[in-house]
Amino acid sequence: MTDSRIDFRRAKFLISAPDIAHLDQYLPGDIGVEIAFAGRSNAGKSSALNALTEQKSLARTSKTPGRTQLINVFQLDDDRRLVDLPGYGFAQVPLALKHKWQEALGEYLQKRACLSGVVVLMDIRHPLKDLDMQMIEWAVLSNIPVLALLTKSDKLTQSVKMKTVNDVRAALKEFGDKVQVETLSSLKGTGKPKVLSILNDWCHPEWLAEQKAEQASASELAPE
């Protein structure tokens, strides 16, 4: 664990990409660090992002799940970004469009070199649906750490919450330490310190220091 803390409250909107199938055209260069947030359309992803950054409207919430399919990128500092991926699995979205999103999401996970971690958000009352498992498996196969984040934890009693957490951890045991399971209540803030600690560690991968050293060396060698 690193002692260098990232202030997630400093997150600010950077750019939106209208089509996930052409994500590379809109995202910044494949350098630095990105942490992706993915989840079903009713998983409370926007509320979680707002709670973690202590900003009420950083990520726009919608009363109609699946309505907004923009990819929103938020900048933490010059080297680090949060990527809010479109919600998946909403019933009213045409099947062909669902398939396109899933294909593009899989490609993003497999090819984005600066991706340091993926947060897969799930309503704690309905965890580990098929698409959730697919996202987790894609990330693990791409050697990307995963945080399986059970949202809306205030909806359950403490005993039921802990049983659900234990059940989910048991179901994901095959992935070993590549997948962590935690809970979050965006409403009450419970679970937030642990989640931020994990995200902070992801913001400091070993390859970031190597990348910055290479950039500095190239800059020194460049003709004036």
Swiss-Prot record:
Name of the coding gene? engB
- In Swiss-Prot or TrEMBL terms, this protein is called Probable GTP-binding protein EngB
Q: For binding Mg(2+), which residues are annotated in this chain's numbering?
A: 46, 68
Domain EngB-type G as annotated: residue spans: 31-205
Q: Name one GO biological process term.
A: division septum assembly
UniProt keyword Flavoprotein present: no
- So which cofactors does this thing need? Mg(2+)
PANTHER family per the record? ENGB-TYPE G DOMAIN-CONTAINING PROTEIN (PTHR11649:SF13), MSS1/TRME-RELATED GTP-BINDING PROTEIN (PTHR11649)
Tell me which Pfam families the record gives.
MMR_HSR1
Record bears the keyword Transmembrane helix: no
- Which PROSITE patterns does this one have? G_ENGB
Q: Which InterPro entries match?
A: G_ENGB_dom (IPR030393), GTP-bd (IPR006073), GTP-bd_ribosome_bio_YsxC (IPR019987), P-loop_NTPase (IPR027417)
List UniProt keywords, sorted A-Z. Cell cycle, Cell division, GTP-binding, Magnesium, Metal-binding, Nucleotide-binding, Septation
- Entry-linked CDD domains: YihA_EngB
Would you say which domain of life the source belongs to? Bacteria
This entry carries the following GO cellular component terms, namely:
cytosol
Sum up the protein's function in the record's words: Necessary for normal cell division and for the maintenance of normal septation.
One GO molecular-function annotation for this sequence? metal ion binding
| Binding residues for GTP | 39-46, 66-70, 84-87, 151-154, 184-186
Q: Which family does it belong to?
A: Belongs to the TRAFAC class TrmE-Era-EngA-EngB-Septin-like GTPase superfamily. EngB GTPase family.
